[in-house]
């Protein structure tokens, strides 16, 4: 009887007029939205009120009661979500509109804008813009400022240009006035001449920035002496110089489909420092003695400065084919042949030692985009890691193990790659999960390096991809540390990389530390602590840019095959309430299968994201790691997602 009482409604509204709430705006595809106060409480924002705000805005809203329902009226903007963004031009009847290209706000179109960019705008032009005025703060309207033109719609390089702009990453390798570069370090007298040794390089056939060369020989006592020689850019690049500042800002060489954007000017990375064949080059070298069981005799490890001359630039494919007795390629001479065979022997005994005493990363399939000269996608191929890849990788891991030990012993600091295995909370979850499969570990055991290695070896023998997936989910992320810490995933007490100083600034830092020890520098300072968050942030941006460029290229590739009704094998990699995320085995493209295409009767379906399992009528039908058969339904132009359906 009180439900529609006018006096009661009036009283409630009086109370609600004073009720203000702060939260974050969440939009929906249907126009209305919600104000999220915390993870448990949200308030409804009708479509008309959503026109004053943008998804992600932090606002203060007034709560009113309408039809006995709590409604938010946005009142004060605390912080706008949209600041600088990527957008595209829409041109209708000679009127310019700008559409934001951002998740959740793709439907937001601005028609008020200003710009200092002089251009006759075309439909589909990509731009960088920033929010100038906000409807909730400035005169009830939105407006933007177009800062920069990125690319035309039909430019074949648009995917690269747009995504690199989105993450504020460079589109070209750095350029400098190369004439000023001199040998500033005066270390010529401290370098040992090893140009007479038969060093070789093994890389991709088109690689120009060659940063490692290898030489190995057998000793009288049936041991192997491996010398890993690494290009030495710090011979020419002093700390806090212009080129060093460039490298410090870029942090990594950015490897993208079709081309690379180098960390250093190419005059350094592909010429002056590159270990090209038959050219004398300065290097930082590590001599590693390996016994016949594959163990590194750490006390006999030696770091030193040297001159080398590579006797041959070999490709991964040719070396692998020759070792597997495939194809027609032959080493140029007996000396190179001997080096390949000895390196292969080194790989086998070192790999065997690490399997027994540390951990080996599983082989992951990689995919390569084959592009035409006009940047069209010709094909996508599966790239498996070859024997030659593994030879070089094993050599670099050995050198990095030695560097970690050397820096720990001499300085007690450096840039260390570390991984802590599990935190306490997830260790307990992992233990409880493993019990279901009769795999028993204590908390104390699983949180030690030896216990973690024991677990991983047991799982490798078990060869259950689902269990591996669940355990992987419980694991911590890798870290960078200034002090020596264990690397659980490698099964090593400490690990520090230094073998790619022309591609990674962190390796250049460790280079300088090792060189400082070699030349007897008295005062050696630890790396600046600010470099670690910079490396992590830059790595994240590069990884996200690569992911989104590849998504765009997959979109282009499959957009041409819209009518393709082929069946594809796909690996389930994630399960959420909304559906299945999977990866096509043939090309590596990520697909999404909405819940409606998994099973027609929704109430019979249970998608457990935590367990990574799909139940139908309470029976397990699909789980993460399963291989399923799918067909592609549609390609979403807005978010570049590929939608697929299950084929039973």
Swiss-Prot record:
Catalyzed reactions: Exonucleolytic cleavage in the 3'- to 5'-direction to yield nucleoside 5'-phosphates
Gene Ontology terms: biological process: mRNA catabolic process
Gene that this polypeptide is encoded by: rnb
GO molecular function: exoribonuclease II activity; RNA binding
Enzyme class: hydrolase
Enzyme Commission identifier(s): 3.1.13.1
Subcellular location field: Cytoplasm
Name the UniProt record assigns to this protein: Exoribonuclease 2
Keyword Hydrolase among record annotations: yes
Function: Involved in mRNA degradation. Hydrolyzes single-stranded polyribonucleotides processively in the 3' to 5' direction.
A Pfam match: RNB
């Amino acid at each position: 009887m009180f439900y529609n009482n006018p006096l009661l409604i009036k009283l409630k509204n009086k109370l609600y007029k004073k009720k203000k709430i702060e939260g974050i705006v969440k939009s929906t595809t249907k126009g209305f939205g919600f104000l999220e106060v915390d993870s448990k409480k949200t308030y409804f924002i009708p479509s008309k009120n959503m026109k004053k705000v943008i998804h992600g805005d932090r606002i203060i809203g007034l709560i009113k009661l309408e039809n006995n329902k709590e409604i938010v009226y946005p009142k004060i903007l605390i912080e706008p979500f949209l600041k600088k963004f990527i957008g595209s031009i829409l041109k209708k009847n000679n009127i310019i509109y700008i559409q934001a290209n951002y998740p959740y706000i793709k439907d937001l179109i601005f028609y008020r804008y200003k710009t200092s960019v002089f251009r006759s705008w075309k439909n589909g032009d990509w731009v960088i813009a920033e929010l100038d005025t906000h409807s909730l703060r400035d005169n009830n309207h939105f407006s933007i400022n177009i800062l920069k033109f990125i690319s035309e719609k039909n430019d074949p390089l648009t995917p690269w240009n747009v995504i690199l702009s989105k993450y504020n990453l460079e589109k070209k390798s750095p350029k400098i006035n190369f004439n000023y570069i001199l040998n500033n370090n005066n270390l010529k007298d401290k370098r040992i001449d090893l140009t007479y040794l038969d060093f070789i390089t093994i890389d991709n056939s088109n690689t120009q920035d060659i940063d490692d060369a290898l030489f190995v020989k057998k000793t009288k006592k049936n041991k192997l002496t491996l010398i890993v020689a690494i290009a030495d850019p710090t011979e020419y690049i002093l700390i806090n110089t212009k080129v060093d500042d460039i490298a410090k800002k870029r942090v990594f060489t950015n490897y993208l489909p079709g081309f690379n954007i180098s960390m250093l000017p190419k005059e350094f990375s592909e010429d002056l420092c590159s270990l090209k064949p038959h050219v004398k080059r300065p290097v930082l070298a590590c001599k590693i003695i390996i016994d016949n069981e594959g163990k590194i005799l750490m006390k006999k490890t030696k770091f030193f400065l040297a001159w080398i001359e590579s006797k041959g630039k070999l490709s991964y494919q040719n070396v692998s084919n020759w070792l597997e007795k495939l194809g027609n390629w032959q080493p140029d001479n007996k000396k190179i042949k001997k080096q390949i065979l000895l390196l292969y022997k080194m790989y086998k005994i070192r790999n065997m030692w690490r399997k027994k005493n540390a951990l080996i990363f599983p082989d992951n399939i990689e995919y390569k985009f084959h592009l035409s000269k006009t940047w069209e996608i010709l094909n996508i191929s599966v790239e498996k890691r070859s024997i030659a890849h593994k030879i070089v990788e094993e050599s670099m891991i050995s050198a990095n193990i030695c560097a970690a030990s050397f820096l720990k012993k001499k300085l007690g600091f450096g840039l260390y790659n570390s991984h802590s295995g599990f935190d306490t909370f997830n260790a307990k979850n992992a233990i409880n999960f493993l019990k279901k499969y009769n795999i028993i570990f204590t908390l104390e055991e699983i949180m030690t390096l030896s216990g973690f290695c024991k677990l991983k070896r047991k799982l490798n023998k078990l060869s259950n991809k689902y269990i591996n997936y669940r355990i992987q989910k419980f694991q911590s992320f890798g870290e960078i540390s200034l002090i020596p810490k264990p690397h659980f995933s490698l099964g090593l007490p400490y690990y520090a990389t230094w073998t790619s100083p022309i591609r990674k600034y962190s390796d250049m830092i460790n280079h300088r530390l090792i060189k400082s020890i070699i030349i007897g520098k008295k005062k050696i300072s630890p790396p600046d602590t600010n470099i670690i968050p910079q490396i992590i942030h830059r790595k994240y941006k590069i990884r996200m840019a690569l992911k989104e460029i590849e998504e765009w290229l997959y979109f282009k590739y499959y957009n041409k095959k819209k009518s393709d009704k082929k069946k594809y094998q796909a690996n389930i990699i994630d399960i959420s309430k909304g559906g299945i995320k999977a990866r096509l085995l043939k090309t590596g493209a990520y697909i999404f299968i909405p819940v409606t295409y998994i099973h027609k009767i929704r109430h019979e379906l249970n998608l457990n994201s935590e367990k990574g399992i799909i139940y139908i009528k309470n029976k397990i039908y699909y789980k993460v790691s399963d291989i399923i058969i799918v067909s592609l339904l549609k390609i979403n132009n807005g978010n570049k997602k590929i939608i697929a359906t299950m084929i039973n």
